[in-house]
């Protein structure tokens, strides 16, 4: 039987990014990709974009090791909106105002934001090297790379900026983020051979130097109302191109995030809300073998 059968969970969202938080710090059992897919089942499951699993801390001074799953069962290195949901959950239960977590992408520090309903997560230092993103071939300058869809002489989307925020991101600069069928183009670009680990695909419009609008096709989850790491990647990419300041507001379909690419150490700070929806226990039938 799955470790998640009958296990408690919290359904939350980070500005529209659907999140399920499961605290398994008192267990040695492991969640499998099959478990993660079962949770999102249309037959009695809990719809989500990311599943955040808290496991026993492996390092002194950390609250937990966070395993992050997309709804297709694949693992993610980072999820900014999910981390804010975890932070709210921990802070409300313990009364803390600061915490450190370990993820596959490294250590993340978090703290209470400038207002009671805001939470800030230090998403770490972005990476720009083609091997770090990673890309399947060498690009010396990742501010733009040669990639397009559509006719060669009249491409529909082209020349994205690429960034790693612990997961790979490609940002296409457009005049109107709603003018493109992202549900059609997103999976084609996510699975393009240039991205050996697939990629998150974002359409971004720079409104002015401190405001950017985006839509994202999320790797392993699909079209989403919000992707925190995509907001971070977009802010960083725009600043690298000197088209935006290092402290910007990002508008997503689900809401707004404040992103600061801190100049003194290049860490990316993400500030936004985290909304609690309901609690429950997983139905064991979700994890029963088919047949």
Curated annotation (Swiss-Prot):
EC number: 5.1.1.7
Site (Could be important to modulate the pK values of the two catalytic cysteine residues) location in chain: 169, 218
BP GO terms, sorted: lysine biosynthetic process via diaminopimelate
Residues reported in the UniProt entry to bind substrate: 17, 50, 70, 80-81, 167, 200, 218-219, 228-229
Catalytic activity from the UniProt record: (2S,6S)-2,6-diaminopimelate = meso-2,6-diaminopimelate
Pathway noted in the entry: Amino-acid biosynthesis; L-lysine biosynthesis via DAP pathway; DL-2,6-diaminopimelate from LL-2,6-diaminopimelate: step 1/1
InterPro entries named in the record: DAP_epimerase_AS (IPR018510), DAP_epimerase_DapF (IPR001653)
Any one GO MF annotation of this record: diaminopimelate epimerase activity
Entry keyword Isomerase: yes
Record keywords, A-Z: Amino-acid biosynthesis, Cytoplasm, Isomerase, Lysine biosynthesis
GO cellular component, one term: cytosol
Pfam families for the chain: DAP_epimerase
Highest taxon, organism lineage: Bacteria
Active-site residues, as the UniProt record annotates them: 79 (proton donor), 227 (proton acceptor)
Places the protein is found: Cytoplasm
NCBIfam families on file: DapF
Summary of the function given for this chain in its UniProt record: Catalyzes the stereoinversion of LL-2,6-diaminopimelate (L,L-DAP) to meso-diaminopimelate (meso-DAP), a precursor of L-lysine and an essential component of the bacterial peptidoglycan.
Assembly with partners or alone: Homodimer.
Family: Belongs to the diaminopimelate epimerase family.
Family annotation (HAMAP family): DAP_epimerase
Protein name as catalogued: Diaminopimelate epimerase
Species this protein is from: Bradyrhizobium diazoefficiens (strain JCM 10833 / BCRC 13528 / IAM 13628 / NBRC 14792 / USDA 110)
């Amino acid at each position: 039987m799955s470790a998640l059968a009958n296990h408690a969970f919290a359904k939350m969202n980070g500005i529209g990014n659907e999140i399920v938080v499961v605290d398994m710090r008192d267990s040695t059992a492991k969640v499998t990709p099959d478990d993660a897919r079962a949770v999102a089942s249309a037959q009695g499951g809990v719809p989500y974009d990311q599943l955040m699993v808290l496991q026993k801390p492996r390092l002194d001074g950390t609250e937990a090791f966070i395993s992050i799953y997309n709804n297709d069962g694949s693992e993610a290195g980072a999820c900014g909106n999910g981390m804010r949901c975890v932070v709210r959950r921990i802070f409300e239960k313990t009364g803390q105002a600061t915490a450190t977590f370990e993820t596959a992408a490294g250590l993340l520090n978090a703290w209470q934001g400038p207002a009671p309903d805001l939470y800030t997560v230090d998403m770490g230092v972005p990476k720009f090297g083609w091997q770090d993103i990673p890309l399947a071939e060498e690009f010396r300058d990742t501010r733009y790379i040669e990639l397009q869809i559509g006719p060669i002489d009249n491409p529909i989307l082209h020349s994205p900026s690429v960034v790693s925020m612990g997961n790979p991101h490609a940002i296409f600069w457009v005049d109107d983020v709603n003018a493109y069928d992202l549900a059609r183009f997103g999976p084609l670009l996510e699975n393009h051979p240039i991205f050996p680990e697939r990629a998150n695909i974002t359409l971004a419009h720079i409104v002015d130097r401190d405001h950017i609008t985006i839509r994202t096709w999320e790797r392993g989850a699909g079209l989403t109302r919000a992707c925190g790491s995509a907001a971070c990647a977009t802010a960083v990419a725009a600043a690298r191109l000197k088209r935006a300041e290092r402290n910007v507001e990002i508008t997503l379909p689900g809401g707004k995030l404040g992103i600061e690419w801190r100049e003194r150490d290049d860490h990316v700070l993400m500030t936004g809300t985290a909304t609690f929806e309901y609690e429950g226990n997983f139905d064991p039938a979700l994890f029963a073998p088919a047949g």
